[in-house]
Regions:
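C-terminal secondary-structure termini that scaffold catalytic or DNA-interacting sites
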Residues: 20, 31-53, 60-62, 81, ...
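Catalytic-site neighborhood detector that most strongly recognizes the C-terminal catalytic loop/helix
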Residues: 29, 134-160
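Residue-level signal for well-ordered alpha-helical positions
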Residues: 11, 68-69
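Short, polar N-cap/turn motifs at the start of nucleic acid-interacting alpha helices
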Residues: 15-22, 125-145
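Short, basic (Lys/Arg/His-rich) helix/loop patches that form interaction surfaces
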Residues: 1, 56, 64, 71-136
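Short, charged phosphate-coordinating catalytic segments
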Residues: 1-30, 128
Length: 168
């Protein structure tokens, strides 16, 4: 989905529309530093920008997975079982342990967001749509920080340019 970890942790079942096949991002979970106690406190707040409020279409694969999780989930939140938003730090640690247990090379959770954006662009999705799905207020953020062309894409680009110019 390209969701931020705080958005994943704050996702409630009521934000998942199975009929319309859409996830609505309306909250985020996080931590804020308390200067007096010198500790962090968990937060459940509205997203950071106007563009962060958004609807994300659900793929067939994710729709199936969400329906299966909903059958066994006692929580009002999609992630976790406590009845309150999962702590992003704890979920990040869980994700790292899961990758290790499955013998999958380590990737930071935020790397999934980069991979999502890159795969969308590789699939010929237009930049503006990808930017909106990610919740960016500026398309330049999407292009500069999240889209990573691979060698095949660069080779195809050169081939297209050569064909256009009729260079053999």
């Amino acid at each position: 989905t390209g969701m931020r970890i705080g958005e994943v942790c704050a996702l409630r079942w009521e934000d998942v529309d199975f009929r319309q096949k859409v996830i609505t991002i309306s909250y985020t979970a996080g931590r804020i530093y308390n200067c007096e106690s010198r500790t962090t406190e968990r937060t459940f707040t509205s997203p950071k920008t106007r563009n962060s409020y958004r609807e994300i279409p659900i793929s067939r694969q994710l729709l199936f997975a969400l329906k299966e999780v909903k059958k066994i989930s006692p929580s009002r939140f999609v992630v976790g079982t406590s009845g309150r938003p999962e702590d992003p730090r704890s979920y990040r640690d869980f994700f790292a342990r899961l990758l290790k247990r499955l013998n999958i090379p380590h990737i930071v959770f935020h790397g999934l967001r980069h991979t999502f954006a890159t795969r969308c662009i590789e699939s010929q999705c237009d930049y503006k749509t990808v930017s909106v799905i990610l919740g960016h207020s500026n398309i330049a953020t999407t292009l500069n920080l999240y889209v990573h062309p691979n060698l095949n894409q660069k080779q195809r680009c050169i081939e297209r340019m050569s064909n256009f110019l009729k260079i053999k």
